[in-house]
Amino acid sequence: MILQVLEFNYLGVSSHAMSYQLRQAEIPILPAGHAPIRVLHFSDLHLTPARKTEIADIKSFIDLSPDLVISTGDFLAHMQAVPVALDALDALLDLPGLFVFGSNDYYAPKPKNPLKYLLPDHGKRIHGEDLPWPDLDKGLQSRGWINLNRSRATIKIKDTTIETRGTDDAHLEFDDYSLVAGKPGPCDIAIGVTHAPYLRILEGMAKDGLDAIFAGHTHGGQVRLPLPGGSRALTTNCDLPTWRARGLTKFGSEPYLHVSAGMGTSPFARIRVASPPEVSLVTLTSAPQY
């Protein structure tokens, strides 16, 4: 079975700050009788102190009343962005949260042609100075969020025990799935969290029997081809097929994959074509009983 949720019919081009769109999806993986769990999934904020629109949007996320928050990385895009990010997320940090980092949490962005992502990836990474990611890590963990970059953890949300695991950024080849590999322990469901959805990560998590995977990185393709009734990603900036560039998809018996198209862009390439900024509200529900 191949599943892909309907995408937004957005064919605009923008090079300035835009308010986000809300993507909603449902994943039927909970045991029968368990209460639904509202998961707020966001990614790729690429925050700078100047991004007032995005900061205000992030502060409004609490109004979606999530039970669990998952961030799949790239919080930062500026040396002074850590206090900005922690302030924007302040209300959400009172909720259970899981996070991993992306390349832009480690290194400042540098000017480059955004259309280069349409070319074959030769593995060469261009990045700027080191960013103060340890301060971000400390700030998030001090409020109770769990760093899944190289770890597993078990949490309980409502009446559901969730085993979680994650990897560091595969785009920088910082990932090492062997550190968290193995079948889930006692739990109701098992989920994976990673920034860049490279197939080696997805395949490892699928082999271990996870129920769902959350990722970001792709920006939904960032520059999509407008088509009647929707649009098509031209790239994912990794080896994930373009039809899975954003939203909820499922292939065969593999775990559900939810890829956030993200909120931001590099400060040097503030353009998104037919791929508006978005945040997702993913509701985990009980599987249908037949």
Map each language-model feature to its residues:
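Conserved beta-sheet core of the metallophosphoesterase superfamily
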Residues: 98, 197-280
